């Protein structure tokens, strides 16, 4: 009977020590939950970056393979035109009176858009 008490006491002490390590020791449950949250956050960040990389890779492939993408980018970002094309810039007429004077002035004809052709050889 005495041996059972010692065995029970040793098992209780062992259980208490294991519980202490589980809740408060290194690698405890709080740290594990915090690390799992960090992993989830990093996984979301990685997925966004993976999608961005795929889009950039598709753009690089398109620029390497097709002239249409290069031409479109040259036209929109650099303002380039093909030989023999005529570029038209539409400039709207600016009002001659300041805004306060416009309210007091009689209504004028609506401003007409003018087109200035620019020829490039």
From Swiss-Prot:
Function recorded in the entry: Essential cell division protein. May link together the upstream cell division proteins, which are predominantly cytoplasmic, with the downstream cell division proteins, which are predominantly periplasmic.
Membrane topology designation: Single-pass type II membrane protein
Record has DNA damage as a keyword: no
Ranges in the topological domain labelled Periplasmic: 25-121
Cellular component terms (Gene Ontology): cell division site; cell septum; plasma membrane
Places the protein is found: Cell inner membrane
Transmembrane segments: 7-24
Assigned keywords, A-Z: Cell cycle, Cell division, Cell inner membrane, Cell membrane, Coiled coil, Membrane, Transmembrane, Transmembrane helix
Main location: membrane
Chain spans, region Disordered: 98-121
Cytoplasmic side: 1-6
Family: Belongs to the FtsB family.
UniProt feature coiled coil, ranges: 31-66
Keyword Ribonucleoprotein annotated: no
Pfam families: DivIC (PF04977)
Protein name: Cell division protein FtsB
Oligomer status and interactors: Part of a complex composed of FtsB, FtsL and FtsQ.
GO biological process entries: FtsZ-dependent cytokinesis
Protein origin, superkingdom: Bacteria
């Amino acid at each position: 009977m005495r041996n059972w008490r010692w065995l029970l006491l040793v098992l209780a002490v062992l259980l208490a020590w294991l519980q202490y390590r589980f809740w408060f020791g290194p690698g405890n449950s709080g740290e594990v939950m915090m690390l799992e949250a960090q992993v989830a956050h990093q996984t979301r960040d990685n997925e966004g970056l993976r999608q961005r990389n795929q889009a950039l890779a598709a753009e690089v492939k398109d620029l390497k393979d097709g002239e249409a993408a290069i031409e479109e980018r040259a036209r929109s970002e650099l303002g380039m035109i093909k030989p023999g094309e005529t570029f038209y810039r539409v400039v709207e007429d600016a009002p001659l009176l300041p805004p306060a004077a416009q309210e007091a002035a009689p209504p004028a004809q609506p401003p007409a858009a003018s087109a200035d052709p620019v020829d490039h050889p």
